[in-house]
């Protein structure tokens, strides 16, 4: 394409916001953190301790929702649509046309939220037992879901649904007493969007640039001026290679999210990145977030890097994986019922799988953050609603054994405790959705005060005409874990019926009622008190 003088002036005008951004940051003091006890020096964060409210909460729900969800083709669409040979590339070509003519920016209008009812959804989430809720703040695609000061064109108020999605979610959550969190996935956006700066390598559109190369859209796809000539070809999806001006932009943008919406929790998709800039986001959260009567920060920052989170500093998050044993400090698993972004035709996790994960994680001192992705409209599909209803029915009966509990001496017994689980918090567990469902032989424990709760992850099989019997070997008279002699055992959901039991060297044998409790196929919980 021949550049005329008029076209050159048009491109320079379009690029002006990004050029101004770079020049502004070049003249700006490195960081401006709200004054408080925390700074962007790592040692200053070591006084942080995880607040009790998080250890009590146990279960949160996340709406991983934005323009990429609106397309209905699953995860990482804004990147993979530009990579030849991927499912998303082929999908895009068939549905929208060649990437050199229709780019990601041209799809943002599909994110309509035209059937989004946040008040109703938050009622559903609260009834399902969630004690905290997460909104997407910004994903790797660089599209902000609030009225962003540092992304004025590509945000949910200026385009797409034309609503402050984060602010509306926050108001709905807080009105119901739920703690409110936001997620930011921005730290790797600079190189994650590199494929948008490429072109087809073959076919009728070979060598025709994708829209990431157009300076008019550098505020979305990033300005690679000054980067190595082959940067777009070599950049890795999680490389987090970015110039200094962009790292400061990252800090200011996340700070803007924090300052506008005062979240109780901030999830970062990775670790504390970019040295003092990442540490500055943690300090900003803790200095501006909620405080207890003891003047301790009650905010939570999540990192997936173990070295970030001890001593103090933050809570360790495990994406799509869990721990094998009890951890000394509270932690979190974040996972989803399907893809992170909404995908048509996908098979979701069953309610049984969700409850299995929740109970297992809580028994090990963890919390479960469960993503239920929303489509373009903002209205869950019928299967998502069915899953929510099943979880609701189960937590109504068994929530006493989940919330405000702490781990026991051991997390459980049974066949599943002998399975070694992949536990690297920086990597997905490829077998997360392939693990067999837990059964009545799989026992998990929690405690609250002097009360022990024992979960059996199913209703025990009934032998002939005899009532079903549950045997807990860890509570045998000669077990090193046994607290003593039980004096009262109740099945949650049947509080008025003390259960018959015997205890010997083979275990605690509990006779269950003739009729199972509702949702017992997902798991049951027993309240056990000792002399």
Predicted regions and their residues:
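Secretory targeting signals
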Residues: 1-3
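N-terminal export signals
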Residues: 7-26
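Mature catalytic domains of secreted/periplasmic carbohydrate-active enzymes
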Residues: 27-531
């Amino acid at each position: 394409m021949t550049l005329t003088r008029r076209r050159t002036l048009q491109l320079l005008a379009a690029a002006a916001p990004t050029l101004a951004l770079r020049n502004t940051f070049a003249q700006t003091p490195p960081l401006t953190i709200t004054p408080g006890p925390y700074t962007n020096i790592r040692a200053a964060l070591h006084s942080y301790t995880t607040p009790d409210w998080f250890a009590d909460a146990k279960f949160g729900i996340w709406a991983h929702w934005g323009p990429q969800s609106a397309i209905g083709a699953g995860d990482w669409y804004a990147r993979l649509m530009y990579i030849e040979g991927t499912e998303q590339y082929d999908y895009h070509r068939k549905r929208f046309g060649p990437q050199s003519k229709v780019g990601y920016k041209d799809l943002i209008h599909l994110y309509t939220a035209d059937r989004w009812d946040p008040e109703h959804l938050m009622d559903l989430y609260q009834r399902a037992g969630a004690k905290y809720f997460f909104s997407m703040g910004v994903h790797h695609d660089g599209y902000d879901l609030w009225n962003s000061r540092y992304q004025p064109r590509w945000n949910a108020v200026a385009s797409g649904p034309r609503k402050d999605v984060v602010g509306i979610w926050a108001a709905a959550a807080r009105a119901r007493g739920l703690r409110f969190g936001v997620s930011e996935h921005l730290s790797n956006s600079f190189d994650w969007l590199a494929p948008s700066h490429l072109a087809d390598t073959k076919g009728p559109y070979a060598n025709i640039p994708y829209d990431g190369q157009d300076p008019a859209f550098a505020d979305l796809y990033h300005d690679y001026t000054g980067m190595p000539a082959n940067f777009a070809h070599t950049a890795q999806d999680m490389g987090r290679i970015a110039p200094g001006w962009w790292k400061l932009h990252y800090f200011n943008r996340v700070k803007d999210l924090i300052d506008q919406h005062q979240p109780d929790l901030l999830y970062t998709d990775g670790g504390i990145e970019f040295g003092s800039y990442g540490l500055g986001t943690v300090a900003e959260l803790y200095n501006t977030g909620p405080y207890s009567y003891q003047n301790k920060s009650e905010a939570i920052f999540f990192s997936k890097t173990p070295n970030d989170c001890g001593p103090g500093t933050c809570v360790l998050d495990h994406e799509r994986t869990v721990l094998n044993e009890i951890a000394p400090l509270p932690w979190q698993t974040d996972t989803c019922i399907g893809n992170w972004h909404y995908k048509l035709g996908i098979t979701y996790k069953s309610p049984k799988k969700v409850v299995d994960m929740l109970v297992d994680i809580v028994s090990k001192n963890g919390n479960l953050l469960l993503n239920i992705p929303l489509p373009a409209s903002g209205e869950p599909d019928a299967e998502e609603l069915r899953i929510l209803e099943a979880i609701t029915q189960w937590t109504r009966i068994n929530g006493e054994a989940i919330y405000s509990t702490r781990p026991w001496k051991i997390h459980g017994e049974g066949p599943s405790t002998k399975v070694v689980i992949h536990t690297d918090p920086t990597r997905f567990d490829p077998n997360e959705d392939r693990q067999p469902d837990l059964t009545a032989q799989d026992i998990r424990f929690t405690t609250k005060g002097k009360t022990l709760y024992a979960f059996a992850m199913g209703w025990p099989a009934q032998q002939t005409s005899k009532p079903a019997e549950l045997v807990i070997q860890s509570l045998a008279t000669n077990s090193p874990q046994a607290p003593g002699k039980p004096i009262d055992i109740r099945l949650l959901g049947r509080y008025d019926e003390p259960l018959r039991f015997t205890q010997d060297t083979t275990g605690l044998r509990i006779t269950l009622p003739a009729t199972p409790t509702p949702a017992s196929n997902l798991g049951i919980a027993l309240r056990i008190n000792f002399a």
